Amino acid sequence: MSLVNFSMTDIARQISRPTFFLLLSVFLACTQSLDLRRLETVSMLGAELYSDSGGDSLLTGIGTRLSAEPNNLSILMEKGSALEGLRRYKEAVEIYSQCLVISPESPEILRRRGQRYISLRKLDNAITDLELAARHHTFIKAENLKYTENLNWAIWYYLALTYYLQADFENALTAFQRSYDYSADNVSLLASVNWIHNCLRRLGRSDEARQVVEPIKENMGYSGNYYKCILVYNGTKTELETINYNTVKGFEMCTIGYGMANFHWVNGDKEIALKIFRKIVAEETWQANGFLAAEAELSRIQ
């Protein structure tokens, strides 16, 4: 009997009942897990991008509280965050749209929805929201503020990223420079420096790009993937010391990989850059900024 013609009954005859039912339960669990994944959007390259499965118990608890207070912005925003964590960005956008009916000029809600429009590859929508957020927000420089709490920085940073994805490097540079001005911790500072450098290199302003990254050195208390990129940009480290393309995965692959690929691209090594771009978009972390950037690069040369 050909293996491809095996039915569940055929398999059951070949193995013990306990083993059969164990295998069946595993198969059904896997199938249900796959069914819970939702199609979120289509990439700039035409690939289908899916949400994560699970999280129902958390959402059920939030839903119970919302049923008692359906217009409670705090609970609605909590639900939006939970949906983001599951990469259910379409539903998160719907929640933030509901929030904006209640508070239509909220810079924080506009920023959150704008950021998730980026994840959904709706870049024009993202720019509209993020420009509105900048218009309605009162920017006051803060000190020692974690990047996740720094709305000043986040508005400019994600607006800049959207321009960058559209290859509008002049506007991206201006917005990234503003994000740098409002950075209040090492993470936000290094992220802004990284992208300012990339914009300047794309604009052919190599001397300025070197000046931006030159002050960042080892043993300054910095860390993270953007820091690793910057040390390559300024010649402190080599690419070989920084990333192993055979082992690195996920966000690290997307962030450092894009930085290195872009560095190759502006230095004229475009075939190497393209190879890395393609490796990045083979990852599962399709929400990562580096993934988005690599995807945008490849979409422009198809």
Segments from the language model and where they lie:
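Residue-level recognition of tetratricopeptide repeat
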Residues: 81, 115, 161, 198-200, ...
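Flexible helix-coil transition and linker loops at the boundaries of alpha-helical arrays
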Residues: 63-70, 135-149, 181-186, 245-246
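N-terminal leader/linker segments that initiate helical-solenoid repeat arrays
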Residues: 30-78, 85-86, 302
